[in-house]
Design a protein with these regions (language model features):
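N-terminal amphipathic/basic-hydrophobic helices that include classical n-h-c signal peptides
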Residues: 1-16
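Terminal helix/beta-alpha structural elements that buttress the NAD(P)+-binding lobe
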Residues: 13-49, 56-60, 64-91, 100-362
């Protein structure tokens, strides 16, 4: 199979469009709080800076990070007002004066963190990756954030995911949970996890043992099976204690935290809390010298030295047909308040997207 790599601009036309300011539609969180603070506005976007590339956004990703940023609990986030959009796929429309790696019209994607829920985005050239034209855009977009995060959880956060090991994943029918499940199964692990009961039948067909989160029966069941070698927990806060409790104790085991979704699960009326204190407590468990259990916290970081290496690896897996990204729901940009109002109630499994270009598939 062909290897997915950036570039390809050297032998292609280099004429640049005239650098002008454009009028665009974009999403804005006017203040932290409920969905009423989400709107789509008309704004101006400046030409790309020296080392930036301006892209016409086709699809933007939508995930729990959007909800966390709206309520103001995403770690180290910007202050409101802000434009969300953690990742995107689109086409290059203009290069900055010192950018030449990609050519106008080339299909690209990036982990943007902000500003992708807009018709155009300016982004540093170093964060872009080229996407082969034969790869489905939404599949590629799912890889950039959800599946790349899962790849890091499986291959960077621990070395214990392997054949015969028991892996427990909370929120296994979510975008990152489903991706983590798939990559663990590819490694030969036995996979267990919590999910909405409506998704249990489809998960069993994949060879997974699902549990209902709310009744806590999964704790006794996993202990009866000997405990988990790895637990992935995106819920955080006090929930880390329950996850720690189901780790196997007479063999090396690891609890990996990767989120603070308790803020979302508690509903709009609950007071949001900072994730930082619970993360400190999670990592403090490593100070216990009389156990083989350990902890870590993983987050995706586009400036990490292994980020591009991992992204290329998982994009190549997609290109080789080793997995497919299930799509749960796609919304139009102009209806962006809807996912904020219905988050957590959407049936199905997989990744969610925002269609920015109305001519793209919905």
């Amino acid at each position: 199979m062909s290897e997915v790599r950036d570039g390809g601009a050297a032998n292609l036309p280099t004429r640049q469009p005239k650098m002008t300011t454009h009028t665009i539609r974009k999403v804005v969180y006017s203040a932290f709080g409920g969905p009423s603070n989400v709107s789509v506005v008309t704004a101006q976007i400046a030409p790309p800076a020296k080392y930036e590339v301006q892209c016409d956004v086709i699809y933007s990703g939508f995930s729990g990070a959007d909800i966390q940023m709206r309520i103001g609990t995403y770690p180290l986030q910007k202050s409101a007002p802000l434009t969300p959009g953690y990742c995107f796929v689109g086409r290059v429309s203009a290069n900055g004066p010192k950018s030449s790696k990609f050519y106008p019209g080339q299909l690209v994607g990036a982990l943007s963190m902000y500003d992708a829920e807009a018709q155009k985005i300016n982004i540093a050239e170093k964060y872009l990756i080229s996407i082969p034209e034969h790869v489905d855009m939404r599949q590629a977009l799912g890889v950039i954030l959800d599946w790349n995060t899962a790849y890091g959880l499986v291959h960077r956060a621990t070395d214990l995911v392997k054949k015969g090991q028991r892996v427990f994943i909370h929120s296994i029918s979510g975008a990152v949970g489903y991706a983590t499940m798939t990559l663990c199964l590819l490694e030969g692990a036995e996979v267990y996890g919590t999910a909405s009961e409506r998704n249990h039948a489809s998960l069993r067909e994949l060879g997974v043992t699902p549990f209902t989160y709310t009744d806590k029966n999964w704790k006794a069941e996993m202990k009866q099976r000997g405990g988990a070698h790895v637990v992935y927990d995106p819920i955080g806060f006090e929930h880390y204690n329950d996850s720690w409790d189901i780790l196997i104790r007479n063999e090396p085991s690891r609890l990996v935290g990767f989120g603070g979704n308790m803020n979302i699960l508690q509903g709009e009326d609950a007071k949001p809390r900072s994730q930082f204190p619970s993360q400190v407590k999670l990592l403090a468990k490593n100070g216990c010298l009389v156990t083989k259990r350990s902890t870590s916290f993983y987050y995706i970081d586009r400036d990490r030295s292994t980020y591009m290496e991992d992204l290329h690896a998982v994009m190549s897996m997609l290109d080789q047909g080793k997995f497919e990204v299930p799509i749960k729901k796609t919304w139009d940009l102009e209806n962006i308040r809807e996912p904020h109002e219905t988050w957590g109630k959407i049936p199905g499994v997989g990744s969610c997207f925002v269609r920015v270009d109305p001519n793209a598939a919905l």
